[in-house]
UniProtKB/Swiss-Prot annotation:
Name of the molecule in the record: UDP-3-O-acyl-N-acetylglucosamine deacetylase
PANTHER family given in the database record: UDP-3-O-ACYL-N-ACETYLGLUCOSAMINE DEACETYLASE 1, MITOCHONDRIAL-RELATED
Record keyword Hydrolase present: yes
GO biological process: lipid A biosynthetic process
Gene3D superfamilies, alphabetized: lpxc deacetylase, domain 1, lpxc deacetylase, domain 2
Reactions performed catalytically: a UDP-3-O-[(3R)-3-hydroxyacyl]-N-acetyl-alpha-D-glucosamine + H2O = a UDP-3-O-[(3R)-3-hydroxyacyl]-alpha-D-glucosamine + acetate
Annotated InterPro entries: Ribosomal_Su5_D2-typ_SF, UDP-acyl_GlcNac_deAcase, UDP-acyl_GlcNac_deAcase_C, UDP-acyl_N-AcGlcN_deAcase_N
Pfam families: LpxC (PF03331)
Source organism per UniProt: Campylobacter concisus (strain 13826)
Superkingdom of the organism of origin: Bacteria
Upper lineage: Bacteria, Pseudomonadati, Campylobacterota, Epsilonproteobacteria, Campylobacterales
Amino acid sequence: MKQTTIARRVETVGIGLHKGEPIRLILEPLDANSGIILHREDLGISFKAEPKNVINTQMATVVGNEKGFISTIEHLMAAVNGYGIDNIRISVDANEIPVMDGSAISFCMLLDEAGIRHLDAGKKVILVRREVEVIEGSKFVRTSPSRNPKFDYTIKFDHPVIGEQRYLFEFSKSSFVKNIARARTFGFLKDLQRLQAQNLALGASLDNAVAIDDTHILNPEGLRFENEFVRHKILDAVGDLSLLGAPLLGDYTAFAGSHDLNHKLTLALMADEKNYEIATLSGELLKEYQKVFA
Protein backbone atom coordinates (compact mmCIF):
# COMPACT_ATOMS: atom_id res chain seq x y z
CA MET A 1 0.00 0.00 0.00
CA LYS A 2 1.25 3.47 -0.91
CA GLN A 3 1.44 6.65 1.13
CA THR A 4 -1.23 9.24 0.45
CA THR A 5 -1.74 12.97 0.31
CA ILE A 6 -4.66 15.05 -0.90
CA ALA A 7 -5.11 15.53 -4.64
CA ARG A 8 -5.64 19.30 -4.62
CA ARG A 9 -5.56 22.39 -2.45
CA VAL A 10 -8.80 23.23 -0.63
CA GLU A 11 -9.80 25.87 1.86
CA THR A 12 -12.67 26.94 4.07
CA VAL A 13 -13.50 29.52 6.72
CA GLY A 14 -14.91 28.82 10.17
CA ILE A 15 -15.20 30.35 13.60
CA GLY A 16 -12.52 29.83 16.23
CA LEU A 17 -13.83 28.28 19.44
CA HIS A 18 -11.90 30.51 21.80
CA LYS A 19 -11.59 33.85 20.01
CA GLY A 20 -14.94 33.64 18.24
CA GLU A 21 -13.42 35.16 15.09
CA PRO A 22 -13.32 33.86 11.47
CA ILE A 23 -10.32 31.66 10.63
CA ARG A 24 -9.17 30.61 7.17
CA LEU A 25 -8.13 26.95 6.93
CA ILE A 26 -6.10 25.71 3.95
CA LEU A 27 -5.21 22.08 3.20
CA GLU A 28 -2.46 21.38 0.67
CA PRO A 29 -0.76 18.27 -0.76
CA LEU A 30 2.75 17.28 0.33
CA ASP A 31 5.34 14.87 -1.04
CA ALA A 32 5.93 11.39 0.39
CA ASN A 33 7.59 11.17 3.80
CA SER A 34 6.71 14.78 4.63
CA GLY A 35 4.24 13.89 7.36
CA ILE A 36 1.63 16.29 8.70
CA ILE A 37 2.83 19.89 8.79
CA LEU A 38 0.95 22.61 10.67
CA HIS A 39 1.55 26.18 9.47
CA ARG A 40 0.67 29.61 10.85
CA GLU A 41 0.13 31.84 7.81
CA ASP A 42 0.00 34.97 9.94
CA LEU A 43 3.35 34.23 11.61
CA GLY A 44 5.12 32.39 8.79
CA ILE A 45 6.09 29.45 11.01
CA SER A 46 5.56 25.70 10.71
CA PHE A 47 5.86 22.69 12.98
CA LYS A 48 5.35 18.98 12.52
CA ALA A 49 2.39 17.26 14.12
CA GLU A 50 4.22 14.93 16.51
CA PRO A 51 4.21 14.23 20.25
CA LYS A 52 7.31 16.27 21.06
CA ASN A 53 5.63 19.41 19.68
CA VAL A 54 2.57 19.16 21.96
CA ILE A 55 2.78 22.09 24.40
CA ASN A 56 -0.64 22.01 26.09
CA THR A 57 -3.42 19.46 26.64
CA GLN A 58 -5.58 21.22 29.22
CA MET A 59 -8.73 21.86 27.15
CA ALA A 60 -7.57 20.74 23.71
CA THR A 61 -4.46 19.44 22.00
CA VAL A 62 -2.08 22.31 21.23
CA VAL A 63 1.11 22.04 19.16
CA GLY A 64 3.74 24.69 18.72
CA ASN A 65 7.04 26.14 19.85
CA GLU A 66 8.42 29.33 21.36
CA LYS A 67 7.38 31.31 18.26
CA GLY A 68 3.70 30.33 18.15
CA PHE A 69 1.12 27.57 18.44
CA ILE A 70 -2.04 26.09 16.93
CA SER A 71 -4.79 24.94 19.30
CA THR A 72 -7.76 22.59 19.00
CA ILE A 73 -6.21 20.44 16.31
CA GLU A 74 -7.80 17.13 17.37
CA HIS A 75 -10.99 17.12 15.27
CA LEU A 76 -9.20 17.91 12.02
CA MET A 77 -6.43 15.47 12.90
CA ALA A 78 -9.06 12.80 13.54
CA ALA A 79 -10.41 13.28 10.02
CA VAL A 80 -6.89 13.13 8.56
CA ASN A 81 -6.22 9.94 10.54
CA GLY A 82 -9.62 8.46 9.72
CA TYR A 83 -8.95 8.98 6.01
CA GLY A 84 -5.48 7.44 6.28
CA ILE A 85 -3.72 10.54 4.95
CA ASP A 86 0.03 10.41 5.54
CA ASN A 87 1.21 13.74 4.16
CA ILE A 88 -0.63 17.07 4.30
CA ARG A 89 0.03 20.73 5.04
CA ILE A 90 -2.54 22.40 7.30
CA SER A 91 -2.46 26.21 7.36
CA VAL A 92 -4.45 28.70 9.43
CA ASP A 93 -4.24 32.46 9.82
CA ALA A 94 -4.83 32.36 13.60
CA ASN A 95 -3.83 30.34 16.66
CA GLU A 96 -6.54 27.67 16.43
CA ILE A 97 -8.28 25.35 13.98
CA PRO A 98 -11.87 26.50 13.28
CA VAL A 99 -14.40 24.55 15.33
CA MET A 100 -16.91 24.10 12.47
CA ASP A 101 -19.89 22.16 13.94
CA GLY A 102 -17.90 20.72 16.85
CA SER A 103 -17.35 17.37 15.15
CA ALA A 104 -15.05 16.13 12.36
CA ILE A 105 -17.66 15.78 9.62
CA SER A 106 -16.97 19.20 8.03
CA PHE A 107 -13.31 18.25 7.75
CA CYS A 108 -14.28 14.91 6.19
CA MET A 109 -16.32 16.77 3.59
CA LEU A 110 -13.35 19.05 2.90
CA LEU A 111 -11.10 16.02 2.42
CA ASP A 112 -13.70 14.49 0.09
CA GLU A 113 -13.56 17.71 -1.93
CA ALA A 114 -9.76 17.56 -2.03
CA GLY A 115 -9.60 13.91 -3.06
CA ILE A 116 -6.86 11.41 -2.26
CA ARG A 117 -3.66 10.90 -4.27
CA HIS A 118 -1.33 7.93 -3.86
CA LEU A 119 2.40 8.58 -3.77
CA ASP A 120 5.39 6.53 -4.86
CA ALA A 121 6.42 5.38 -1.39
CA GLY A 122 5.31 2.57 0.90
CA LYS A 123 2.84 3.36 3.67
CA LYS A 124 4.37 3.23 7.15
CA VAL A 125 2.41 1.92 10.14
CA ILE A 126 3.12 1.51 13.85
CA LEU A 127 2.54 -2.02 15.12
CA VAL A 128 1.98 -2.26 18.87
CA ARG A 129 4.23 -5.06 20.13
CA ARG A 130 3.45 -4.97 23.86
CA GLU A 131 0.88 -3.36 26.14
CA VAL A 132 1.49 0.22 27.26
CA GLU A 133 -0.76 1.87 29.85
CA VAL A 134 -1.00 5.28 31.52
CA ILE A 135 -2.96 5.38 34.80
CA GLU A 136 -3.95 8.40 36.89
CA GLY A 137 -6.22 7.50 39.79
CA SER A 138 -9.25 5.69 38.39
CA LYS A 139 -8.57 6.99 34.86
CA PHE A 140 -6.48 5.14 32.31
CA VAL A 141 -5.62 4.81 28.64
CA ARG A 142 -3.98 1.74 27.14
CA THR A 143 -2.78 0.39 23.84
CA SER A 144 -2.09 -3.29 23.20
CA PRO A 145 -1.26 -5.61 20.29
CA SER A 146 -4.20 -6.53 18.08
CA ARG A 147 -4.89 -8.05 14.69
CA ASN A 148 -8.21 -6.20 14.59
CA PRO A 149 -7.59 -2.62 15.84
CA LYS A 150 -10.44 -1.18 17.84
CA PHE A 151 -11.28 1.59 20.30
CA ASP A 152 -13.01 0.57 23.53
CA TYR A 153 -13.95 3.70 25.48
CA THR A 154 -15.92 4.20 28.70
CA ILE A 155 -16.92 7.51 30.27
CA LYS A 156 -18.70 8.12 33.55
CA PHE A 157 -20.27 11.44 34.55
CA ASP A 158 -22.40 12.12 37.60
CA HIS A 159 -25.04 13.73 35.41
CA PRO A 160 -28.51 12.47 34.42
CA VAL A 161 -27.98 13.18 30.71
CA ILE A 162 -24.65 11.35 30.37
CA GLY A 163 -24.12 8.82 33.16
CA GLU A 164 -21.92 5.88 32.15
CA GLN A 165 -21.46 5.18 28.44
CA ARG A 166 -19.29 2.64 26.63
CA TYR A 167 -18.69 2.32 22.91
CA LEU A 168 -16.64 -0.20 20.94
CA PHE A 169 -15.42 0.99 17.56
CA GLU A 170 -13.57 -1.20 15.04
CA PHE A 171 -11.31 1.14 13.14
CA SER A 172 -11.78 1.71 9.40
CA LYS A 173 -12.31 4.79 7.27
CA SER A 174 -15.90 3.89 6.40
CA SER A 175 -16.79 3.15 10.02
CA PHE A 176 -15.10 6.37 11.19
CA VAL A 177 -17.21 8.50 8.85
CA LYS A 178 -20.42 6.66 9.72
CA ASN A 179 -20.05 6.18 13.47
CA ILE A 180 -17.54 8.70 14.85
CA ALA A 181 -17.01 11.76 12.65
CA ARG A 182 -20.43 13.34 13.34
CA ALA A 183 -20.16 13.17 17.15
CA ARG A 184 -19.89 16.71 18.55
CA THR A 185 -17.90 18.11 21.40
CA PHE A 186 -19.91 18.76 24.55
CA GLY A 187 -19.73 20.98 27.58
CA PHE A 188 -21.58 22.13 30.66
CA LEU A 189 -23.25 25.54 30.73
CA LYS A 190 -21.69 26.43 34.08
CA ASP A 191 -18.20 25.78 32.67
CA LEU A 192 -18.93 27.82 29.55
CA GLN A 193 -19.99 30.81 31.61
CA ARG A 194 -16.78 30.58 33.65
CA LEU A 195 -14.62 30.33 30.52
CA GLN A 196 -16.31 33.23 28.77
CA ALA A 197 -15.76 35.37 31.86
CA GLN A 198 -12.04 34.73 31.16
CA ASN A 199 -12.46 35.68 27.47
CA LEU A 200 -12.24 32.02 26.42
CA ALA A 201 -14.72 29.90 24.43
CA LEU A 202 -16.12 33.10 22.91
CA GLY A 203 -17.05 31.20 19.75
CA ALA A 204 -18.94 28.41 21.53
CA SER A 205 -22.62 28.08 20.62
CA LEU A 206 -25.35 25.53 20.09
CA ASP A 207 -24.17 25.40 16.46
CA ASN A 208 -20.82 23.86 17.40
CA ALA A 209 -21.29 21.96 20.67
CA VAL A 210 -23.75 19.95 22.71
CA ALA A 211 -24.56 22.18 25.69
CA ILE A 212 -25.79 20.71 28.96
CA ASP A 213 -27.26 22.42 32.02
CA ASP A 214 -27.85 20.70 35.35
CA THR A 215 -30.52 18.38 33.99
CA HIS A 216 -31.04 18.78 30.22
CA ILE A 217 -29.47 19.07 26.78
CA LEU A 218 -30.02 22.63 25.55
CA ASN A 219 -29.71 21.94 21.81
CA PRO A 220 -33.24 21.92 20.35
CA GLU A 221 -32.34 19.19 17.84
CA GLY A 222 -31.06 16.88 20.58
CA LEU A 223 -28.29 14.34 20.02
CA ARG A 224 -27.01 12.83 16.78
CA PHE A 225 -26.42 9.50 18.54
CA GLU A 226 -27.85 8.22 21.81
CA ASN A 227 -24.26 7.86 23.06
CA GLU A 228 -22.81 10.86 21.22
CA PHE A 229 -20.72 11.83 24.25
CA VAL A 230 -18.55 8.72 24.34
CA ARG A 231 -18.32 8.63 20.54
CA HIS A 232 -16.88 12.13 20.62
CA LYS A 233 -14.26 11.01 23.14
CA ILE A 234 -13.21 8.36 20.61
CA LEU A 235 -13.04 11.07 17.94
CA ASP A 236 -10.67 13.02 20.19
CA ALA A 237 -8.52 9.93 20.74
CA VAL A 238 -8.30 9.21 17.00
CA GLY A 239 -7.07 12.77 16.54
CA ASP A 240 -4.60 12.68 19.42
CA LEU A 241 -3.08 9.36 18.32
CA SER A 242 -2.52 10.73 14.81
CA LEU A 243 0.42 12.69 16.21
CA LEU A 244 2.35 9.42 16.27
CA GLY A 245 3.01 10.11 12.58
CA ALA A 246 1.66 6.83 11.20
CA PRO A 247 -1.48 4.72 11.69
CA LEU A 248 -1.42 2.88 15.02
CA LEU A 249 -2.24 -0.80 14.51
CA GLY A 250 -3.26 -1.91 17.97
CA ASP A 251 -6.17 -1.71 20.38
CA TYR A 252 -6.91 1.45 22.34
CA THR A 253 -8.83 1.16 25.62
CA ALA A 254 -9.77 4.03 27.90
CA PHE A 255 -11.75 4.86 31.00
CA ALA A 256 -12.35 8.59 31.52
CA GLY A 257 -9.48 9.47 29.20
CA SER A 258 -8.36 12.94 28.18
CA HIS A 259 -6.11 14.80 25.76
CA ASP A 260 -3.45 14.78 28.46
CA LEU A 261 -3.61 11.02 28.99
CA ASN A 262 -3.62 10.40 25.24
CA HIS A 263 -0.49 12.53 24.88
CA LYS A 264 1.22 10.70 27.73
CA LEU A 265 0.32 7.40 26.07
CA THR A 266 2.00 8.42 22.80
CA LEU A 267 5.13 9.41 24.72
CA ALA A 268 5.14 6.19 26.76
CA LEU A 269 4.63 4.02 23.67
CA MET A 270 7.49 5.60 21.75
CA ALA A 271 9.83 5.75 24.77
CA ASP A 272 10.89 2.12 24.34
CA GLU A 273 11.50 0.52 20.94
CA LYS A 274 10.37 -2.82 22.35
CA ASN A 275 6.83 -1.40 22.57
CA TYR A 276 6.35 -0.96 18.84
CA GLU A 277 7.59 -1.66 15.34
CA ILE A 278 7.51 0.75 12.41
CA ALA A 279 6.73 -1.32 9.33
CA THR A 280 5.86 -0.85 5.67
CA LEU A 281 2.32 -1.98 4.89
CA SER A 282 2.80 -4.63 2.22
CA GLY A 283 2.61 -8.37 1.62
CA GLU A 284 1.14 -10.44 4.44
CA LEU A 285 0.95 -7.41 6.71
CA LEU A 286 -1.23 -5.62 4.18
CA LYS A 287 -3.53 -8.64 3.87
CA GLU A 288 -3.88 -8.76 7.65
CA TYR A 289 -4.81 -5.10 8.11
CA GLN A 290 -6.43 -4.30 4.74
CA LYS A 291 -9.88 -3.63 6.20
CA VAL A 292 -8.52 -0.91 8.50
CA PHE A 293 -7.98 1.25 5.43
CA ALA A 294 -11.20 0.31 3.62
